[in-house]
Each structure stands twice: as C-alpha cells, then as structure tokens.
C-alpha cells in the first residue's frame, strides 16, 4: 500500500509539472501531428529489390546463377517451360485455340499487361514479354502454368502476375480465359 502511495505522488507531481509547462493546444497539436504522420507511413513507396538476396539466403551459393533452376526450352510452345512463359501465371492460349500472340476466337484482349524479361536459349538473348489476358469465357483449364521467374509483389503491379488483368477488356468481358505472351522487343 505504501508503494502505491509513492507512485501516485510521483505521477501526480510529474503530470502537474507537465501541465504547468505546456499548453493543451500545443500538446494536442503535437499528438495530432504524430498520429497523422504514423497513419501516412504505409503510403510511402517501397522498393525491396535490394532485399531479394537476403530473402533467398538458403538459395544458390555465391557465383552460381540464381536462375539456374529455370531451364527454358524452345520446342514445345504449349509447355510451361517454353522460354516465353518464364513469368506466366494462368493458362496458355495456344492450348485453347489461340496462339502466342492472338486470343482464341470469341475472347477479348485485355488492354493492360504485365511484363517480364525471358531468356531465349536458341539465340542466347533476353526478350521483353508483355503478357496479356484474354477474357470473356470461363477459364479453359488447359495448359495451366505458374511460373514466377522475375515476378515482383503486387505493390509493383507491372511486374506482378497474380492480378487478373481483364478489367480493361472490351464489352465488360471480365472473366479470365487464358494468357498470350507476345514479344515487345529485346531486353538490354
């Protein structure tokens, strides 16, 4: 009981001293500034590209190519390991009546795309691929692929393959069907 009394006295003296030296408006203003600043911190841009090596600490040893596990081929365009499909997340349109560059008949091409740099083993060059979704029919279910080579999290949407990009398709065709992978140009 005696310990509580001393603590109460100490808190009372401290609070009276603070109240005597500061104004209420100033304290409330500072508190508001701190709270507003803390609320805005999540809105700051984040770029964690430098942390990828630390995130893959158990990955390949130094001097070993981290992309060595991805072995692209240039023969079967309907296979997930075809070189253009290095970052595709969805169904390959070539299996659904389309091609690498054209949507199947009856589907609509989404206006938005995500990009990746894919290595062609035949000519030893890397190419920029602009993946675009074909929309309007239900998911084909043929040739599903989940490749994440070069993918970045959703806060970098131009490099994220987890987003369904059908929101920009004609005629409100919002249902995902498959993905095409046209070449934009050589990656430098």
UniProtKB/Swiss-Prot annotation:
Pathway note: One-carbon metabolism; methylamine degradation; formaldehyde from methylamine: step 1/1
Description of post-translational modifications: Predicted to be exported by the Tat system. The position of the signal peptide cleavage has been experimentally proven. Tryptophan tryptophylquinone (TTQ) is formed by oxidation of the indole ring of a tryptophan to form tryptophylquinone followed by covalent cross-linking with another tryptophan residue.
Disulfide bonds: 80-145, 86-118, 93-178, 95-143, 103-134, 135-166
Cofactor binding, note field: Uses a protein-derived tryptophan tryptophylquinone (TTQ) cofactor.
GO molecular function, one term: methylamine dehydrogenase (amicyanin) activity
Compartments (UniProt record): Periplasm
Name used for this protein in its record: Methylamine dehydrogenase light chain
């Amino acid at each position: 009981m005696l310990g509580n009394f001393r603590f109460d006295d100490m808190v009372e003296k401290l609070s009276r001293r603070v109240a005597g030296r500061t104004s209420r408006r100033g304290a409330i203003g500072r508190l508001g500034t701190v709270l507003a600043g803390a609320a805005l911190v999540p809105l700051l841009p984040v770029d964690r590209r430098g942390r990828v090596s630390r995130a893959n600490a158990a990955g390949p040893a130094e001097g070993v190519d981290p992309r060595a596990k991805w072995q692209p081929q240039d023969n079967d365009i309907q296979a997930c390991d075809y070189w253009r499909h290095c970052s595709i997340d969805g169904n390959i349109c070539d299996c659904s009546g389309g091609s690498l560059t054209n949507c199947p008949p009856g589907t609509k091409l989404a206006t938005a795309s995500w990009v990746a740099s894919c290595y062609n083993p035949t000519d030893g060059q890397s190419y920029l691929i602009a993946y675009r979704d074909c929309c309007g029919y239900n998911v084909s279910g043929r040739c599903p692929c989940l490749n994440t080579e070069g993918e970045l999290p959703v806060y970098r949407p131009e490099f994220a393959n987890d987003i369904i990009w059908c929101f920009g398709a004609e005629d409100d065709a919002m249902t995902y069907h498959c993905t095409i992978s046209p070449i934009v140009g050589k990656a430098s």
